[in-house]
């Protein structure tokens, strides 16, 4: 089953986004291994990754005629590679089926492991995002396993590899 944040997140701008040729897909299931205070995603023990998901996401993007696709995921701390290989397979599948679609990935921190970041980077997404979410002072209160400085290092590493790095903050959390 494919998941989009447009639908699962009840996005009020879904029609506008889809009309402009953009959508956000969530891969690796709908159950997160973390339980961040700001997020409404279910947490617990997720199912194994669906090996058909990369091809299904790529085909959905083709059928929707998307010009810009954003891929995000739940955190998968239960997997030895945090889902990095699945991320890379998804990017490669999208690029193969939709060579003109811009692919932005919004990745977890992979516990700061550069070997896992490299797996995603070498799949060649157009933009690699990792959200810091909030200021350093309240990070421990709202992000269950994340570390502010580790997130900065993740972004620094992505940029040092020549990739376009992007981040986001939520307003109103301190």
Where are the model-predicted features located?
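Short, glycine/charged-rich beta-strand-loop motifs at protein surfaces that mediate ligand recognition
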Residues: 168-173
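An N-cap/entry alpha-helix motif that binds or orients negatively charged groups
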Residues: 1-15
């Amino acid at each position: 089953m494919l998941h989009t944040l447009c639908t699962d997140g009840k996005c009020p701008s879904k029609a506008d986004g889809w009309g402009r040729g953009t959508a956000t897909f969530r891969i690796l299931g709908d159950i997160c291994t973390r339980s961040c205070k700001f997020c409404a995603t279910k947490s617990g023990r997720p199912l194994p990754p669906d090996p058909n998901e990369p091809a299904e996401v790529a085909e959905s993007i083709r059928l929707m005629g998307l010009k810009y696709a954003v891929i995000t995921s739940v955190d998968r701390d239960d997997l030895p590679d945090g889902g990095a290989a699945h991320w890379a397979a998804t990017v490669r599948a999208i690029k193969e089926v939709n060579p003109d679609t811009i692919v932005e990935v919004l990745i977890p921190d992979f516990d700061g492991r550069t070997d896992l970041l490299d797996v995603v980077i070498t799949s060649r997404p157009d933009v690699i995002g990792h959200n810091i979410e909030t200021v350093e002072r309240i990070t421990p209160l709202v992000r269950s396993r994340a570390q502010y400085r580790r997130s900065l290092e993740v972004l620094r590493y992505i940029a040092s590899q020549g990739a376009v790095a992007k981040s986001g903050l939520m307003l109103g959390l301190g």
